[in-house]
Amino acid sequence: MSMDYDITPQRQVYLDARGYTILTACPGSGKTTSIVKKLLTVSHHCEEHYGTHTGFACLSFTNKACAELKQKYKEMHNERLTYPNEVLTIDSFIMQYVVLPFWYLCDECKKRPIVVNETEILDRIYYNNIQINGKWQQYPVMALRTYASLMRRKNPSLVSRDKTAFKWKHKPVIDANEIAYCNAAFTYRLEKGFISSSDALWMACDILEHHQGIAKALVMRFPYVIVDEAQDNSELHFEFFKLLKRAGLQNLEFVGDICQSIYGFNNARPELLQSMMKEGGWNVLPLSECRRSNQRIIDLYSKLKSSDVPAITSHGVEDKEIPIVVYKYDDGNVRDIIRNFHQVCENNDLPSRYIFRSIPVHFPAAY
């Protein structure tokens, strides 16, 4: 049994869109379902216009999100996603199609890399264990020994590199000595073949920038790229897709909501997506019909969102005239709030109960 999908004029415009598209999707607009609806048509588009060896790459940030896309695709189209199409996390796509096949083209990398995102494990590569007088002691590796005092204050595993600068804990490093330390720490782990996901992204951009033939081959293999949750892209993520665009990618979609970025702690730059929306060459489309909340709740939420975001309207949701309850939570009252929430639902005969804890960019809230 296939999944029902209500095609409204707004949705139809997105389904028909090709080229460079930015879809701004409000909460409850059916973003994921709309992507899934479009994927089957896009697969046919690739086959007809670019050849049977080509397909789409639909990319998101988590394995859970990718699993949901695959499951909904199966439910809607009564078939599984198969070669030559891919639904992957951005990290997996970068590793599988750029870093692992072409790591040797990155000057800093001397060994086939493996991804290690656990800081406790990554930190170990920077130290040697030496037995002195029967006791094991830890010393920095020779390449970083001159930065021993800095290593105690700033873990080398938390060093990262973006397009123009080094960072520590995702904050730019400006002191000359600290920049030299970050460069030594970054270079050392790439030489040893131990990298973080952030390092892999930097390597991918470095490889594509200096070897455009690889970027062009990737575009020939995947002539249609859809990026879900695009508001959580970092500057390097956007640079990666810019390099594909420069190599001839003619169909690129960014789908997301700049009000719902949850990876600000991990270099997410939703404002870059917002800036792109104002550039020429992009077809900016809204999905602003919310199927989750009544208009009163939407109007309250709209007081908090950016004025640049299209106005949201309720679509097909009955208003039961129940007073809106706004909870302010902290670590000490979460259980009480959940208990009260269930009681309010019970009192108003609401069988479906969902609790979301949001992590907006600018303020804490609970719904």
PLM regions: where:
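P-loop NTPase Walker
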Residues: 1-105, 216
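Hydrophobic "anchor" residues on beta-strands that sit immediately upstream
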Residues: 85, 219, 224-227, 253
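A short beta-strand-to-loop transition that corresponds to the Sensor-1 phosphate-sensing loop
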Residues: 39, 60-63, 90-91, 255-259, ...
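Conserved Walker B
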Residues: 222-233, 258-259
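Accessory N-terminal region flanking or inserted into the helicase ATPase core
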Residues: 1-27, 33-34, 55, 131-224, ...
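Helicase P-loop NTPase motor core
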Residues: 281-283, 288-367
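DNA-processing P-loop NTPase/helicase core
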Residues: 96, 101-134
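Conserved RecA-like helicase ATPase core segment
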Residues: 235, 240-318
